[in-house]
Amino acid sequence: VGSFSRFRPTPANFAIFASPNRAHQFLDDIHEYVVQHQSTNAFVLGSFARFTSGFLGFFMCGIVGYIGAQAAAPIILNGLRRLEYRGYDSAGICTVSVGGIEIRKRAGKVADLESTLHVSAMEGTSGIGHTRWATHGVPNNPNAHPHADASGTIALVHNGIIENYLTIKKKLVKAGYAFASETDSEVLAVFIGMLFEQTGSLEQAVRTALVEVDGTFGLVVVSSQEPDVMIGARRGSPLVLGIGNNEFIFASDASAIIAHTRQVVYLHDNEMAIVHRNGTYVTKTIGNEATESAIEEIEFELDAIEKGGFDHFMLKEIFEQPNTFRDGMRGRLQIEDGNVRLGGLSAVGDALRAAQRIIITACGTSWHAALVGEYLIETLARIPVEVEYASEFRYRNPIILPHDVVIAISQSGETADTLAAIREAKMKGATVIGMVNVVGSTIARETDAGVYLHAGPEIGVASTKAFTSQLCVLTQFALLLGRMRGLGQSEGRALAKELDAIPMKIQNILDRVEDIENIAHEYSSASNFLYLGRGVNFPVALEGALKLKEISYIHAEGYPAAEMKH
């Protein structure tokens, strides 16, 4: 314990987590302390690295990279605007031209890049951009991305956590390198620059650096010494490559790509893509083995990521729920047969019939949906179900039996803790099913089978339509499993009819928007809310409380109604 007790969980220390920036600084302070005392705190250091990878992974930065024949800066700027919903505290752009690389960045909003730094006028037909939410170092101009190497000829943007950055930084400082920021990302840029000096190859320098790195990354690298090349790589942080007409766009989210192309490659973990201005590209592992990544097509339309006349994305998505719920049933729900067709599960049909236990793992809102799924599956299929926080699942060495089926639920399909949970389950021999919204996401690729939500892009940070779509899919899954396990056709038909009526009932509620506004106004001065529910409505109470906390920052708690008397 000793002096480490200054980081004890006091009310003052917990209070700082109301501000992400202060929270990150607090975590940095702890990390610095533990590294300085790692000989006596080796266990704490390892635990802290795992904790920060999960906690800080919640704050998603945005990446855009472009190489082609058009002016890069306006394309990158528009891409960053598409990623603003992810949350950030600073932004920046780097372009590559005959004069070298030019970086303009600052703390603040993407709009500030244009209003104060005039980034759209930056020259060059290739470049990278970034929106940052601080993980190492406070939000200020030097800590903003992109970061350059010591020579000023290489630049990168990076999402993720470099867990061993202090070790690498000490070696670089000893070799005479200096740093302008407090970030782990600049350490990686300088490291790549040093390796480029040794190898003369940007690809080789990036690959060698990433082999040495512990942690997670989604990154894009450019160099004025190889101006016709751009390199992207990922491990634990999503990165998508858009393929246009003799042009390429890297992004952390397909929403930044769709305005330019619908053809994309979703990079896998420990995979890199090397793209060239002449329109050619290759993908390979970080270990330099060739890979064959399939070209896929973005399914959603551009207007799906526009506000469509609403003041907020969240409000738009709330009003989309009648349609998104219906889309989750389309082609699946067989009302007269009282059954469901889920083609994505055909490969695991035998495993579902033989299943003796189902484990559902998820985080946040998806965990609340999983609790509803527990009620439904046990009621309709009479199979025992356990619901696990993905963030806790792998750390307790879970017992997985031969006929267990694990279901992973995630809107994005990229939730780091849920990914770690499914990898643990697969390692222990479980059949793993994914229920995700984003086509081509990592969870969709790594599970044995799965079901898409078909909710369309969810831009709002607080989940709405994805939650109801998860309930839609879970209900159909429970019905399918029930019919496999002896549930009668008449019972199935009755449930299917009720499920089919839900979109209309959602619409009826949304039509009462004035009543809802009046209720909100009446209770707007309250400082505490208690959401109560029993049975299947207890998870709904948890979700309701979470929504109020997320959006209003008013304290709210979901609680089992029957427990009030205790």
Locate the predicted segments by residue:
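Generic beta-strand/beta-sheet core signal
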Residues: 157, 222, 233-234, 242-244, ...
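Hydrophobic alpha-helical scaffolding
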Residues: 66-69, 158, 178, 195-199, ...
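Glycine-rich phosphate-binding loops that contact phosphosugars or nucleotide phosphates
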Residues: 350-487, 493-501
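Short, solvent-exposed amphipathic alpha-helical segments in soluble enzyme
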Residues: 79-83, 235-238, 266, 373-379, ...
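Active-site phosphate/pyrophosphate-binding segments
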Residues: 321-325, 329-359, 449-566
